[in-house]
A protein has these predicted regions:
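Retroelement reverse transcriptase polymerase core
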Residues: 1-199
Length: 199
């Protein structure tokens, strides 16, 4: 998905006003890991996902998660913020219903919304709540990051909004995983075209 218009969706972080904001202190890390964080922050900053923030009320630490290929994924520990945020009750589909709906189709195309979360902008009034600390400063995401309590519900909401008339007919959506299904070969390419034009 290209950047999604904020008139369609933006991610909000409502917080319980009785819960006090938490500022996590910078955690110690191996020097080689801090360099990986610096590299990832620079990359995300340069593509416009991040901005520098001063005096944030909420502040979380970065956590590096090793990947199978030897690289690491930079995540943010939003546990404190997530505790203060009420659950978004937008429904996620039942997996068994999705499986039943694709049964019997001749062709299935599986798609993953690559960097899909990052196509959804943060609501301006909530942007600084997702602030995080590094050895080089504090930043916040201008786009919806992984790790926020209701990010999956927000993504499901936008996918349902964009594809509502195709779901359970030609397509199935579970958060950022999408399946285009067709009963015959001739219908599959036009169905895929319709999907990609919409997304």
């Amino acid at each position: 998905m290209p950047e999604i218009d904020t008139d369609i969706v933006q991610h909000c972080i409502p917080t319980d006003p009785t819960m006090k904001p938490v500022k996590q202190k910078l955690r110690r890390m191996k020097p080689e890991w801090t360099l990986k964080i610096k590299e990832e922050v620079e990359k995300q900053y340069n593509v416009g996902f991040l901005r520098v923030v001063n005096y944030p009320e909420w502040l979380a630490n970065v956590v590096l998660v090793p990947k199978k290929d030897g690289k690491v994924r930079m995540c943010v520990d939003f546990q404190d913020l997530n505790k203060a945020s009420p659950k978004d009750d937008f429904p996620l589909p039942h997996i068994d219903v999705l499986v039943d709906n694709i049964a019997g189709h001749v062709l299935l195309s599986f798609m993953d919304g690559f960097s899909g979360y990052n196509q959804i902008k943060m609501a301006l009034e909530d942007m600084e709540k997702n602030s995080f600390i590094t050895p080089w400063g504090t930043y916040c995401y201008k786009v919806m990051p992984f790790g926020l309590k209701n990010a999956g519900a927000t993504y499901q909401r936008v996918a349902t909004t964009l594809l509502h008339d195709l779901i359970h007919k030609e397509e199935e959506v579970y958060v950022d995983d999408m399946i285009v299904n067709s009963k015959d070969h001739e219908a599959h390419i036009p169905t895929l075209r319709k999907f990609f034009e919409r997304i």
